[in-house]
Structures are given as C-alpha cells and as structure tokens.
C-alpha cells in the first residue's frame, strides 16, 4: 500500500478503511491534518476554508461543527446535501474527516446560545455516523468543542455504539484536544493510559492527544509515554493543536 506522502489526489480520495490506516501508518508521523469550520464566513470569501487548508499542505481536512443532517460549508458550490463531502474531496484532493461530539447531557453546557451550541446532526450517534459514512467521510473523530461537556466516559459509550454500526467501514478516532468543559478532565487528566485502553477496546483506530505544550500539564515526556502505549495496542495516534496557539501573535 502506498503512503499518503506518495499518493496523487485520485488515489487519496478513494481509500477504504484498511487502505486509509495503512497509508497513514506508512507515512510514519508525517501526515498533516487541518481542522476547518465551514459554517462561518471563509477566510478567502468565496473559497472554502477546506481548499485554503489544502493549498497550505494539509493531507487531511477535518470538518469541525459539520452537521450531517443539515450540511453547510460556506463558499462551496451548490450541490445536493448528500454530495457535500464528496465535493470537498473533489475540490481539495484531500482525505476528509468530521468531528462528532459525544455530549454528556448531565454536564450543563455553557454554549447553549452561541456559535458553538450543539445541533442534532453533530452528536456522536450511530445514525449520524452512518450518514457520514454514506456521504463519503474517511474518518470520524469523537471529540468535543470548548464548553460542550464531552467527557471521556461519553466518548467510550458513543464509540461502542458507532463501532458496532460502521466500525468495519470507516476509521474511528477518539480523544480530546482540551477539557471540553469537563471539570476534572484538565491537564494530564484530559487523557490517560486507562482512557486509551478503554477507547481502543471500544473500537477506536486512532487516539487523539493534545500536542505537548498546548495544554498546561501536557509535556513532551507525557505524550511520548501515551503514544508509545497506544502503539503497543496497535493503534495510531494524532497530536493536535486545538487551543489557539496556531493563531496567536506572540
């Protein structure tokens, strides 16, 4: 199987799950993903943020706040809703993933009335995952936006349901870039070896981890230990900058 690094667009956008995982693993940590938000005005006005990310070198575009029941990406040419993801693939030549959020309803969200507020099509349910798979999504990431109340226990529960439904067809990633509004899951408690074990047993193919230095308490040594542990379980990892350092001036 070719590495992502050696693929042309037509090869990269038609991979099955096994090919997707193999192509990433063969690239040995050099695959770049970029998360974009499609519901806001594009940085380049009439060009999608996904295309902008691809032009800057992204191999995989991760669509955040993407509602599979009512898909919207500002700047995208008019297509049928079910063709939204495939149109992003056509325009970018990239792999495409989406975030789904296993919101813990017992945790009060601080985002009920703002841009980040949840919609039904963004929830990490088996039905939404099946819709995503039918739309051509390559990877589903179970994670949480700031303040939405996504706990690691909720991620495990959603993983189990989604894995049973589509786990043989689509790559599943799980983890958090920050505490996501859950008191007690900050710093090193964002993710632990026990969380990784539970995610793996629930069906995760890839473990999402904060990159060293992006969250207080997340050191290079700590993430090195977690990555090594995830690899020992046969899982891939993705480290993320999900706390605004990439947009800072200083």
What name fits each language-model region?
Residues 1-37, 47, 81-102, 110, ...:
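N-terminal amphipathic alpha-helix/helix-capping segment at the start of soluble metabolic enzymes
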Residues 44-70, 74-76, 110-239, 244-250:
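Alpha/beta enzyme core
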Residues 38-40, 104, 245:
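Residues that cap or initiate secondary-structure elements
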